[in-house]
């Protein structure tokens, strides 16, 4: 088995020379301004080692990766009642598609497409004002990442609100079916702000530890969330975490993962490591092009695929 340090360093060195980097997201103006020639990677292992490469300490907008953290909190808050309002199946459609909602009476296919994440944000509002729900999300992210400096980028949140017409349509459509139970602007306010959380690869890899270690931040540490909840979230990351590219990611990488259009991916090697990669150029499905390549190479070199014999 090769040394993890060497594998990570080699991947970062090779991808620094890549000529094909995908395209940055342009429908959110603030994301369109991010320089494409960046790549970062961080791995936190079961023994507590942190391995960094490239732009691992550069903060970026985590976007849909935030859906992992809000799902964790919503399940803790309302439990399995959440699954009466959002499904657990891959969608096969674009992450912001409205088509499926019409056929399925306003219930989104899973909590990682935009419509599903808006339902999760709405669930976070049960008994709370939007500011309180956002405070709970930010506190949890800071806690699992062990870094109080993590913040919400208000400029990105404003940019999303000003251009989020498709998400507004999704929310209003679900509200018409009674799937959303709070004012649309409240649910969207939480959603836009959670997506604007700014983190680095180092932050993200640390934050994902509870998913890698059965609900704990270290294999022998105290439980942060129930092990069953962590396992179920990881299962959804494997089947639904990369939009309509989820099957391809599972085929090539074989790890639970959640991507965001900011170019980040959080991936989990159960019992072994939490991994974060970032490169802002996206493939046609909205997933980081170089990030996916990096994770494929890492999983293959370390035999970390959940399907490895």
From Swiss-Prot:
Record InterPro entries: Beta-lactam/transpept-like, Glutaminase
MF terms (GO), sorted A to Z: glutaminase activity
Binding site for substrate: 64, 114, 160, 167, 191, 243, 261
GO biological process, any: glutamine catabolic process
Coiled-coil features, chain-numbered ranges: none
Keyword set, alphabetical order: Hydrolase
Enzyme Commission number: 3.5.1.2
Catalysed reactions listed for this entry: L-glutamine + H2O = L-glutamate + NH4(+)
Keyword check for tRNA-binding: no
Similarity field: Belongs to the glutaminase family.
Alphabetized NCBIfam families for the sequence: Gln_ase, PRK00971.1-2
UniProt subunit comment: Homotetramer.
Protein name per UniProt: Glutaminase
Source organism: Azorhizobium caulinodans (strain ATCC 43989 / DSM 5975 / JCM 20966 / LMG 6465 / NBRC 14845 / NCIMB 13405 / ORS 571)
Underlying gene: glsA
